[in-house]
Curated annotation (Swiss-Prot):
It catalyses: a 1,2-diacyl-sn-glycero-3-phospho-(1'-sn-glycero-3'-phosphate) + H2O = a 1,2-diacyl-sn-glycero-3-phospho-(1'-sn-glycerol) + phosphate. This is Phosphatidylglycerophosphatase GEP4, mitochondrial. SUPFAM superfamilies: HAD-like. Changing residue 47 to N: Abolishes phosphatase activity and impairs cardiolipin biosynthesis. It is found in: Mitochondrion inner membrane. GO terms for biological process: cardiolipin biosynthetic process. Phosphatidylglycerophosphatase involved in the biosynthesis of cardiolipin (CL), a unique dimeric phosphoglycerolipid predominantly present in mitochondrial membranes and which has important functions for cellular energy metabolism, mitochondrial dynamics and the initiation of apoptotic pathways. Required for the stability of respiratory chain supercomplexes and for growth at elevated temperature, in presence of ethidium bromide or in absence of prohibitins. Pathway: Phospholipid metabolism; phosphatidylglycerol biosynthesis; phosphatidylglycerol from CDP-diacylglycerol: step 2/2. It is an enzyme of class 3 (hydrolase). GO terms for molecular function: phosphatidylglycerophosphatase activity. Belongs to the GEP4 family.
Length: 185
């Protein structure tokens, strides 16, 4: 269970705009590159964003766009943040290591699941001298209640991958889409 996600989602009761993305695109292939003129670093979710859920490689249809992203942003400016690979539930970080081998991009080792790991993300980019301000970070993900909420908590640019690799049957994901439409963002 993602306690961080559950507790942070309660913030939406008094501030629903925390789940409002800066940009909405159907799939990773629709992500503009560069993402925005001010963006110097990019956080990427893994499952159903750049990879099929629970897979460790870039979705084949996205490979060309992936390489375009990698040519625009350096390895220090790209960071995969997943609630599976690199999280405290990833024993010996074996999933993180495998994902790094397959993608060539660092995977954040984090003690708190999204959206609660936002300080660890910012620390990573500050330590690598990639950014000077959270506004220079784009968070790209398929979940409003984790990825986009985290982007807004960070004061960063949130890109919602609405449909992902496959349209999710997850009830929470379906609820997020209904809420997004209801709120009229």
């Amino acid at each position: 269970m993602n306690i961080s996600g559950t507790l942070n989602t309660l913030r939406l009761l008094y501030n629903p705009s925390l789940c409002k993305p800066s940009l909405v695109v159907p799939t990773f292939n629709d992500l503009p590159i560069p993402i925005h003129d001010s963006i110097k670093a990019v956080v990427l979710d893994k499952d159903n964003c750049i990879a099929f859920p629970h897979d460790d490689k870039i979705w084949p249809d996205y490979l060309q766009h992936w390489e375009t992203l990698r040519s625009k942003y350096s390895n220090k400016a790209l960071l995969i943040v997943s609630n599976t690979a690199g999280s405290n539930s990833d024993k010996d970080y074996s999933q993180a290591k495998l994902l790094e081998d397959k993608t060539g991009i660092p995977v954040l080792r984090h003690s708190t699941k999204k959206p609660g790991c936002h300080n660890e993300i910012l620390d990573y980019f500050y330590r690598n001298k990639t950014i000077t301000n959270p506004k220079e970070v784009a968070v790209v993900g398929d979940r409003l209640f984790t990825d986009i909420l985290m982007a807004n908590l960070m004061g960063s640019y949130g890109v919602w991958i609405r449909d992902g690799v496959k349209v999710s049957a997850n009830p929470l994901s379906k609820f997020e889409k209904k809420l997004y439409n209801f709120l009229g963002f």
